[in-house]
Amino acid sequence: MLRKYRLMLCISICCTVVNVVHSQSSWVEWKEVVTDDETISEWQEKYQELTEISEHPFNINTITKEQLEQLPFLSDRLIENILYYLYKYGPMVSKNELLGIEGMDYQTRRFLNDFIYIGPSQKETRKFSLKRMLKYNQQDLLIRVDIPFNEKAGYADYSEETLKKSPNKKYLGSPYYQNLRYRFQYKKQVYWGLVAEKDAGEPFFTGPNKKGYDFYSVYLYLQDIGRLKKLAVGNYRAAFGYGLVMNMGFSMGKAYSSASINRFGNGISKFTSTDEFNYLRGVAATYRLTDRWDISLFHSFRTMDARVDNRFIKTLKTDGYHRLNSDIEKKNTINNQLVGSNLNYNGKYVEYGFIAVYNCFNKVLNPDLRPYNKFYPRGRSFFNGGVYGKWFLKKFTLAGEIASDKKGKMAVVQSLSYSPDMKTNIVLINRYYDKKYQSLYANGFGENSRTQNELGSYIGLETSFLKSFKLMGYLDFFYFPWLRYRVDKRNTMGLDGMLQVGYSPSYSLQMFIKYGYKNKAQNYTLPSKTKLVLPSIRHRLHYQLNYAFNEQTMLKTFAEGIFTSHWKQDKSIGYQVGLTAKWGREGFPLKGSITGVWFDTDNYDSRIYLYEPGVLYAFSMYSYYGKGSRLALNVNYKLTRWMILQAKWGWTHYLNRDKIGSGREEILGRDKSDLQLQLKIKW
């Protein structure tokens, strides 16, 4: 009875709270519309990239195809229509003109608004000038600190005798997370900056770290200066074709818009993230040979974290944490050198390219042999080459990539898109990744996190009907010839599907309901200790309603249910209901938001995920299981014309446990709270 009362109370709050407490960009809602639980880590990287664009938007009247392709909610057809509208009707004088573009709906317009501004239609023709760059530039500095209010086991006081027996029982540093970001920009041509980060538990100017922050990243990035299309010095990323050879960027998950799911990588790009693993360090350039042809050359030499012995690299350490003595022992223990090139042709009806990448370690990569990792990359040097292309044939688009490693093992992806009209797009994607294909920098479309040991067929649909409705869905069939981690059986298969209906009758109101299903093999141990490989089944139903009272004030309510099982064994149910309300007023310095959620899950299998508005560049996505509630308050205060203070306080309360977390992350008690503070200075 008490559970029913709490549920009714939470629903009533969701339905009645209207004018509560940050106006946050509308595009963040796109993530909630199209992503799923398993694409969160990929979305985190794209979130930082899109946040940077929204902070420094594009001039719609001089925007390019390459810039529009950075926005994943725009289809290829809609991008062409935007450019055609500007060509036919001339420069826009108001954002309201966006709805005059064929295929532009209310929801897409809201998302696009955050990335554009109305500026002059003529590009500046004056030559690049160092004097003008030093005078007319934009700079900003962000300083962030996260403060926890609960002591975790890893920060407790232990005796010298205890630490001598267990040296990794205690973190080496303070519990505060800190980062610093500096950015210099001149037009859309020159960027350079610094990113520094200290994770919670890492030492700061103490112990094994005397240099302050644990991670530093410096970059210089130039673009569109004469025939020099791009130049990156320092830390950068590279992504070409469909990512079967090289993709360090954002990988489109299966739940994303079918209209843009088969988009090529964006080549060389600046690296502004705090990711301590997924980047290159050196020099890279893209040069325009002609109006249609360009060539990219890139080189990288960097150290990496790894567990090593005298001869071999046993595991690559990718989490970036250096909080324990065991972490310090793995820090910068190996180096990797990489060289690559890409030749690309961009025509009116055809695009294609040739990519080749060679990289080597200073030691032999040889992970401890397990049945499932028999075909993982092994060796000291690796070479991959590939050919990719895209052909536009009226309402059809054919695309694909073929890649090979130095032993001749193949990876292939093919796609066919059909758009009978501006409102409908159907896409079919087939993939074949040999179980022995090896590429350290590949990140292709599929179910596996590795681009190997997978065959699959995907079909996706996106269509609008009855003016205000949008239907999205997909089915993906996949097959794994070899064993996988936690799957001790060959020749397993599975099915992944999603169906979503959205309703957006006006600029102010959007709602959608989404159903997701996944059936995937996984190891399972019966109570009798018998070990089997059984289908792991997950159902997810999510409903959400967004209502914007104006540009500054918005209410979001949502409800979600989860059901999981292992082929009629160990059934687990979970749900959440909650709201987010945002407020602000034009010209008023204070803006904010509040999020409240009630959740109840049987165990970890039916865990739920929650996105919260946070400080700039901080991706706030959390997972919860058990029974409890979550409250978060976010405030944005403009101190002066050039200084903004952001703060986020969060509190989680559990009803069915006396401790939170485990190991060094364990907190005694039922409550957990923390505070994020960030100061932004721009000039």
What name fits each language-model region?
Residues S75-I79, D105-Y106:
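Small-residue hinge/turn detector
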Residues S129-S166, F184, K188-L194, L231, ...:
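Transmembrane beta-strand segments of Gram-negative outer membrane beta-barrel proteins
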